[in-house]
Amino acid sequence: MRTYTIESPYGTLRLVLQTASYAAMPHNPRPLAIVAREENPEYPDETYGVVTVNMDPHTGLKDQTGDRAFVKTYGENGHWVPELMRQLEKSGAAVRTGRSLENGRGVIFPLYEFKPELL
Protein backbone atom coordinates (compact mmCIF):
# COMPACT_ATOMS: atom_id res chain seq x y z
CA MET A 1 0.00 0.00 0.00
CA ARG A 2 1.34 3.41 -0.96
CA THR A 3 0.22 6.70 0.53
CA TYR A 4 0.65 10.13 -1.02
CA THR A 5 0.11 13.33 0.93
CA ILE A 6 -1.28 16.46 -0.70
CA GLU A 7 -1.22 19.74 1.16
CA SER A 8 -4.07 22.10 0.35
CA PRO A 9 -5.37 25.35 1.82
CA TYR A 10 -8.18 23.27 3.34
CA GLY A 11 -6.09 20.65 5.09
CA THR A 12 -3.98 17.61 4.37
CA LEU A 13 -5.31 15.13 1.83
CA ARG A 14 -4.13 11.54 1.66
CA LEU A 15 -4.31 9.39 -1.45
CA VAL A 16 -4.05 5.73 -0.48
CA LEU A 17 -3.45 2.99 -3.05
CA GLN A 18 -4.34 -0.51 -1.91
CA THR A 19 -4.05 -3.78 -3.79
CA ALA A 20 -6.95 -6.19 -3.57
CA SER A 21 -8.04 -9.52 -5.00
CA TYR A 22 -11.59 -10.22 -6.14
CA ALA A 23 -12.30 -13.92 -6.61
CA ALA A 24 -15.63 -13.03 -8.20
CA MET A 25 -13.85 -11.10 -10.94
CA PRO A 26 -11.59 -13.57 -12.75
CA HIS A 27 -11.13 -11.14 -15.63
CA ASN A 28 -9.69 -8.59 -13.18
CA PRO A 29 -7.66 -10.55 -10.63
CA ARG A 30 -5.38 -7.70 -9.53
CA PRO A 31 -7.40 -4.49 -9.25
CA LEU A 32 -6.28 -1.51 -7.24
CA ALA A 33 -8.54 0.44 -4.95
CA ILE A 34 -7.73 4.13 -4.92
CA VAL A 35 -9.05 5.69 -1.74
CA ALA A 36 -8.87 9.42 -1.06
CA ARG A 37 -9.16 10.71 2.48
CA GLU A 38 -8.82 14.07 4.14
CA GLU A 39 -6.96 14.22 7.43
CA ASN A 40 -9.31 16.59 9.20
CA PRO A 41 -9.89 16.27 12.94
CA GLU A 42 -13.50 17.35 12.50
CA TYR A 43 -14.19 14.37 10.20
CA PRO A 44 -11.77 11.64 11.36
CA ASP A 45 -13.79 8.69 10.08
CA GLU A 46 -14.83 9.97 6.68
CA THR A 47 -13.82 8.01 3.60
CA TYR A 48 -13.93 10.23 0.58
CA GLY A 49 -13.74 8.02 -2.44
CA VAL A 50 -13.01 4.62 -3.89
CA VAL A 51 -12.41 3.59 -7.47
CA THR A 52 -11.34 0.22 -8.82
CA VAL A 53 -8.96 0.16 -11.76
CA ASN A 54 -7.30 -2.61 -13.72
CA MET A 55 -3.54 -3.03 -13.67
CA ASP A 56 -2.08 -3.38 -17.14
CA PRO A 57 1.69 -4.03 -17.01
CA HIS A 58 2.16 -2.40 -20.41
CA THR A 59 0.06 0.73 -20.13
CA GLY A 60 -0.19 1.37 -16.39
CA LEU A 61 -3.38 1.90 -14.47
CA LYS A 62 -6.55 1.97 -16.53
CA ASP A 63 -10.21 2.20 -15.64
CA GLN A 64 -11.80 -0.34 -17.97
CA THR A 65 -15.03 -0.82 -16.07
CA GLY A 66 -16.52 2.66 -15.95
CA ASP A 67 -16.15 2.94 -12.19
CA ARG A 68 -16.30 6.45 -10.82
CA ALA A 69 -14.26 8.03 -8.10
CA PHE A 70 -16.25 9.94 -5.53
CA VAL A 71 -14.07 12.49 -3.80
CA LYS A 72 -15.04 15.10 -1.26
CA THR A 73 -12.81 17.61 0.45
CA TYR A 74 -14.18 19.89 3.12
CA GLY A 75 -13.53 23.60 2.91
CA GLU A 76 -15.19 26.66 4.33
CA ASN A 77 -18.76 26.05 5.51
CA GLY A 78 -18.51 22.38 4.57
CA HIS A 79 -18.32 23.05 0.83
CA TRP A 80 -16.36 20.61 -1.27
CA VAL A 81 -13.12 21.76 -2.81
CA PRO A 82 -11.68 20.18 -5.99
CA GLU A 83 -8.10 20.31 -4.71
CA LEU A 84 -7.58 16.58 -5.14
CA MET A 85 -8.98 16.74 -8.66
CA ARG A 86 -6.49 19.47 -9.53
CA GLN A 87 -3.70 17.29 -8.17
CA LEU A 88 -4.95 14.32 -10.19
CA GLU A 89 -5.02 16.46 -13.33
CA LYS A 90 -1.43 17.52 -12.66
CA SER A 91 -0.45 13.87 -12.24
CA GLY A 92 -1.66 13.02 -15.74
CA ALA A 93 -5.02 11.57 -14.76
CA ALA A 94 -7.87 12.23 -17.16
CA VAL A 95 -10.44 13.87 -14.91
CA ARG A 96 -13.82 15.36 -15.74
CA THR A 97 -14.93 17.91 -13.18
CA GLY A 98 -18.01 19.97 -12.56
CA ARG A 99 -20.75 17.38 -12.17
CA SER A 100 -22.33 18.38 -8.87
CA LEU A 101 -24.35 16.02 -6.75
CA GLU A 102 -27.97 16.77 -6.03
CA ASN A 103 -27.14 18.04 -2.57
CA GLY A 104 -24.57 20.40 -4.03
CA ARG A 105 -21.81 19.10 -1.78
CA GLY A 106 -19.66 17.12 -4.14
CA VAL A 107 -18.48 16.09 -7.56
CA ILE A 108 -18.41 12.70 -9.26
CA PHE A 109 -15.84 12.18 -11.99
CA PRO A 110 -14.48 9.23 -13.95
CA LEU A 111 -10.83 8.32 -13.47
CA TYR A 112 -9.48 6.89 -16.72
CA GLU A 113 -5.79 6.84 -15.95
CA PHE A 114 -3.80 7.55 -12.83
CA LYS A 115 -0.03 7.92 -12.60
CA PRO A 116 0.91 7.97 -8.91
CA GLU A 117 4.61 8.32 -9.65
CA LEU A 118 3.92 11.83 -10.96
CA LEU A 119 2.24 13.10 -7.81
What are these regions (language model features)?
Residues T3-I6, L15, R68-V71, V95-R96, ...:
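Hydrophobic transmembrane signal anchors and adjacent membrane-proximal interface regions, especially
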Residues M1-E42:
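OB-fold ssDNA-binding interfaces and closely related basic DNA-contact patches used
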Residues E38-L88, G92:
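Acidic, aromatic-enriched beta-alpha/helix-loop junctions
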Residues I34-A36, V53, Y112:
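Generic structural hydrophobic/aromatic packing signal, biased to beta-strands
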Residues T5, G11, A23, G49, ...:
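Compositionally biased, intrinsically disordered low-complexity regions enriched in proline and serine
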Residues L13, V51, K62, S100, ...:
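Compositionally biased, intrinsically disordered low-complexity regions
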Residues G75-L119:
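Short, compact, well-ordered microdomains
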